[in-house]
A protein has these predicted regions:
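Charged, low-complexity intrinsically disordered terminal segments
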Residues: 1-242
């Protein structure tokens, strides 16, 4: 059923009036241009850089590790916004937020929320605070200022932080690099920590949350943009193990 729903959602976007083919947008290329493009991609595929080699190695290691663990089969539901959301014409049942909470229900025991961009708004902050005050364990992980690639998002999130903490919500912020035990004189003097040489900083990109053994994994950030502007998709999986 989840696969059928995913296919149906894809086709609804593919066939929508707001979807355009590439030739409609940029015109058609010549046969010579197509041949050059094909040659470029073939050469690029053969020229693997160091990062791609590391990714391939990591994939092999992950595949090997996964074979050591049993597969936990569980019921899953594919949910998504309708293309009508873009026009402001979506019915309540065509909005992913309503679908999500219809399936997952109101948290009673616990809620773990991971969101790269976390801007709860007043309504969202009140919702999470009331859960925590009524005995539900609420934990949130989002990017720290240093890890966030959109500083203004952190600025909007920051104004809700104190209130959430005071109401019992547990907040965690992702660090872009691992702290060291020793710092240079410059870092001590300025408070600006320089990442280890050769290691780029990291940021949180995942979006998922768990409500009493039901897990959502998808593209939805806990922010107004995902709720009201973007069209988002995801899976709700009924699994205590997950």
């Amino acid at each position: 059923q989840a696969v059928e729903n995913a296919n149906s959602v894809f086709l609804s976007f593919w066939n929508d009036d707001l979807s355009y083919t590439i030739p409609q947008l940029v015109g058609r290329g010549t046969k010579e241009e197509l041949a050059q493009l094909k040659q470029h991609y073939e050469a690029d595929a053969l020229d693997k850089n160091v990062i791609e080699q590391k990714i391939d190695l990591a994939r092999i290691l992950v595949d090997s590790e996964l074979t050591k663990h049993p597969v936990n089969w569980a019921k899953a539901h594919f949910i998504a916004d309708s293309p009508n959301k873009i026009r402001g014409e979506a019915k309540p049942d065509e909005i992913i937020v309503k679908q999500m909470f219809d399936l997952m229900g109101k948290p009673e025991k616990h809620m773990e929320l991971v969101s790269a961009y976390f801007v709860p708004t007043t309504a969202g902050a009140d919702y999470l605070s009331n859960l925590a005050k009524n005995g539900t364990r609420v934990r949130v992980l989002t990017n720290s200022l240093l890890a966030n690639d959109v500083a203004i998002v952190h600025a909007f999130y920051k104004k809700y932080r104190r209130g959430l903490l005071e109401n019992g919500v547990k907040l965690y912020e992702f660090k872009p690099y691992i702290e060291r035990e020793k710092y240079t004189w410059y870092e001590v003097a300025t408070g600006h920590v320089i990442p280890a040489k050769g290691r780029s900083s990291s940021r949180l990109h995942a979006k998922f949350f768990d409500i009493d053994g039901k897990v959502f994994v998808g593209s939805f950030n806990f922010d107004p943009r995902s709720a009201h502007l973007n069209t988002e998709v995801g899976l709700v999986v009924e699994s205590d193990q997950l």
